[in-house]
Structures are given as structure tokens and as C-alpha cells.
From Swiss-Prot:
The cytochrome bc1 complex contains 11 subunits: 3 respiratory subunits (MT-CYB, CYC1 and UQCRFS1), 2 core proteins (UQCRC1 and UQCRC2) and 6 low-molecular weight proteins (UQCRH/QCR6, UQCRB/QCR7, UQCRQ/QCR8, UQCR10/QCR9, UQCR11/QCR10 and a cleavage product of UQCRFS1). This cytochrome bc1 complex then forms a dimer. It is a multi-pass membrane protein. It is found in: Mitochondrion inner membrane. It comes from Antigone antigone. Its cofactor is heme b. CDD domains: cytochrome_b_C (cd00290), Cytochrome_b_N (cd00284). Binds 2 heme b groups non-covalently. GO terms for molecular function: metal ion binding; ubiquinol-cytochrome-c reductase activity. PANTHER family: CYTOCHROME B (PTHR19271:SF16). Belongs to the cytochrome b family. Heme 1 (or BL or b562) is low-potential and absorbs at about 562 nm, and heme 2 (or BH or b566) is high-potential and absorbs at about 566 nm. This is Cytochrome b.
């Protein structure tokens, strides 16, 4: 009998073992769809990004007008740009839901997979930040100035570090060109990291909603989950297309329609919505270095998730108190996101500080305590 090429060819064999004959737990829910959705987001962003880069000029005098030219004169340039800008938002929606799923179902106990995932998140955040600077509008310029300035909080070498990052004494042409370089490079780095992430995942196999070993009940990835993934793609690409075609500027800042002007500061500098929770945490501490450390901690805290797991059960499926805490954390993040978009004045300052405190308290203190408490409850 002739060997099946899909199973014998050196390259096809790898694809087969990852996407076709992969043994998958039969009970994984729609929460397991976000990994493949992130893959689609990455592919879409790289494709639209390459097409945009072909028409973009990384120069302070030309950047803004080159983006306007792309939207006005390039065939479907407006659509490519709108898909790219809003695709970033969908990328972050998917990654936040993917991380939330990981926290809820204890996926962080696959430490290598989890750690590469957190590194992927950090790389994605860096990519989105440098990308936002490229259109060289007011918010691009001032966002770059404010965020890069945070490095000056580093003791001793801070100022030198910032000037080195800027390539001068302020955000200017060298900054824009290096940000374009980074924005072009990082997505390919994300692609490489994604392969590592998947390699680690396929070492152990997928987790499942019950958090128990599922070797006795696995089904092939194709056709079951390949079809389920295609449904997921449709359900994500439909709202993306709707947003890009009907209200492409809904999530953007109107300030960015004004070309960058170093002499005029916008009344309220704020990042895109997906960074607002971290921005709120940064602002809640009235000290530069403290704020920077809190900002870094807000994301780096994810590395600690495996160490803070004290429960005998892997997932939160049968842990009502942990569930309550988890959804409190989710609501708290929404509050932080809202506070980050508000001006720094009376009610918002204290709300932001309380929400920041709650965020760290839940993750660092309450989750381990409740986990240990639920273990005790198993005895009764």
C-alpha cells in the first residue's frame, strides 16, 4: 500500500501533526477558539501591514501626508488602513480573552507555554505602540513622547537611555524611522514566538474545561475543530469588516487627524483603548518611578500566575469563590480601562487608585488565599 503523503512527507508530516491529526480533548469549548483567532489576526495584520508599508514614507515631513495619500489615492488604500487599524483592536480583544481563558482554566500550569505567551503579549504591546506613532498625528507624537519619557525614571542612566531611544534630544525624524523599522520587524518576531508557543503546547496537548487528563477521550483536530475554528473566523471577521466599513474611526482619537506639532500639547493625552488599563495604573501612583514600576508589574504579574496557584483543582469550573473573584477582576479591569480614558481630576483619581490596588490585591493575595480555602472546603 502506498504511504499517505500527508503522514510521510517531512514537511506535510509536521503540518499534519499540528493541524490535522492532532489529538484534541473532545470537550474544549469556544474559549479555546481564541488561539486560532489570534493566528488569523496576525496573518491579517502582516498582510495589510505589508501593503501599507509599500505606500508609507518614514519621514516626519511626509509620514502624515503619505498615510493620507494611501487612503485617498491607492486602490482600496482606505480599506487596507481601516482593516489594519481596527485589526489591532481585535488582536487585543482576542489576546485578552485568551489570557482570561488561561487564568480561569489553569492553563498557566503549562509553564513554558504560558511564559512564551506572556512574552508574546509584551511583544504585541511593543508592536502596537510603535505602530501607533507612524501616522505622525498629534496623539502619535505626544503618545510617543510621554511613553518613551517613562524610561527617564530609570535611576542613573534614565535620561541617557531616553535620548538613545529618541536618537536625539526629542522625538523627531530618527525616532520615527527607528519606530518604523521596529514595527516592520516585530510582527515577524511574533510569528517565530508563536511557533515556539505552539511547539510547547503540543508537547503537553491542550488543557480542557474540566482540567483533568483527557488522553482517554481525544478526537482528531480535523474535521471537528478545523470547522469550529472556521466558524470562529467568520464570527470575528464579520464584526471587523463591519467596524472597518461603517465606523472605522470609532476607536481612534480625533486628535490624530491633526499633523504632529511639538509646540501644541493636546488637552488630554491618552493611548488606544487596549492600553488604558495599564495607563490608569501608571497614573494612579503620584511618583514617576513608582508609576513606571506599577505599569510594568501590571503585565509582568502574569509570569507569577503558576506560582500563585494554590488550589488542588486546576480549573475554576467547580470553584465558585474563585469564579466570583475572577469576574470581579474582569470588572475591575473594565473600570481601570474607563478611568484611563478620563481626565486626571477628582472622582477619577481615587477610583483609579482603588481599582489599581484591587487589581494587584486580587491577583497576588486573594487568589492564593481563596484557592487554599477551597482546598479546606473539600474536606467537609
Amino acid at each position: 500500500m502506498a504511504p499517505n503523503l500527508r503522514k510521510s512527507h517531512p514537511l506535510l508530516k509536521m503540518i499534519n501533526n499540528s493541524l490535522i491529526d492532532l489529538p484534541t480533548p473532545s470537550n474544549i469549548s469556544a474559549w479555546w477558539n481564541f488561539g486560532s483567532l489570534l493566528g488569523i489576526c496576525l496573518a491579517t495584520q502582516i498582510l495589510t501591514g505589508l501593503l501599507l508599508a509599500a505606500h508609507y514614507t518614514a519621514d516626519t515631513t511626509l509620514a502624515f501626508s503619505s498615510v493620507a495619500h494611501t487612503c485617498r489615492n491607492v486602490q482600496h488604500g482606505w480599506l487596507i488602513r481601516n482593516l489594519h487599524a481596527n485589526g489591532a483592536s481585535f488582536f487585543f480583544i482576542c489576546i485578552y480573552l485568551h489570557i482570561g481563558r488561561g487564568l480561569y482554566y489553569g492553563s498557566y500550569l503549562y509553564k513554558e507555554t504560558w511564559n512564551t505567551g506572556v512574552i508574546l503579549l509584551l511583544t504585541l504591546m511593543a508592536t502596537a505602540f510603535v505602530g501607533y506613532v507612524l501616522p505622525w498625528g498629534q496623539m502619535s507624537f505626544w503618545g510617543a513622547t510621554v511613553i518613551t519619557n517613562l524610561f527617564s525614571a530609570v535611576p542613573y542612566g534614565g535620561q541617557t537611555l531616553v535620548e538613545w531611544a529618541w536618537g536625539g534630544f526629542s522625538v523627531d525624524n530618527p525616532t520615527l524611522t527607528r519606530f518604523f523599522t521596529l514595527h516592520f520587524l516585530l510582527p515577524f518576531m511574533i510569528m517565530g514566538l508563536t511557533l515556539i508557543h505552539l511547539t510547547f503546547l503540543h508537547e503537553s496537548g491542550s488543557n480542557n474545561p474540566l482540567g483533568i487528563v483527557s488522553n482517554c477521550d481525544k478526537i482528531p483536530f480535523h474535521p471537528y475543530f478545523s470547522l469550529k475554528d472556521i466558524l470562529g473566523f467568520t464570527l470575528m471577521l464579520l464584526p471587523l469588516m463591519t467596524l472597518a466599513l461603517f465606523s472605522p474611526n470609532l476607536l481612534g482619537d480625533p486628535e490624530n487627524f491633526t499633523p504632529a506639532n511639538p509646540l501644541v500639547t493636546p488637552p488630554h493625552i491618552k493611548p488606544e483603548w487596549y492600553f488604558l488599563f495599564a495607563y490608569a495604573i501608571l497614573r494612579s501612583i503620584p511618583n514617576k518611578l513608582g508609576g513606571v514600576l506599577a505599569l510594568a508589574a501590571s503585565v509582568l504579574i502574569l509570569f507569577l500566575a503558576p506560582l500563585l496557584h494554590k488550589s488542588k483543582q486546576r480549573t475554576m469550573t467547580f470553584r465558585p469563590f474563585s469564579q466570583l473573584l475572577f469576574w470581579t477582576l474582569a470588572a475591575n479591569l473594565l473600570i481601570l480601562t474607563w478611568v484611563g480614558s478620563q481626565p486626571v481630576e477628582h472622582p477619577f483619581i481615587i477610583i483609579g487608585q482603588l481599582a489599581s490596588l484591587t487589581y494587584f490585591t486580587i491577583l497576588l493575595i486573594l487568589f492564593p488565599i481563596i484557592g487554599a480555602l477551597e482546598n479546606k472546603m473539600l474536606n467537609y
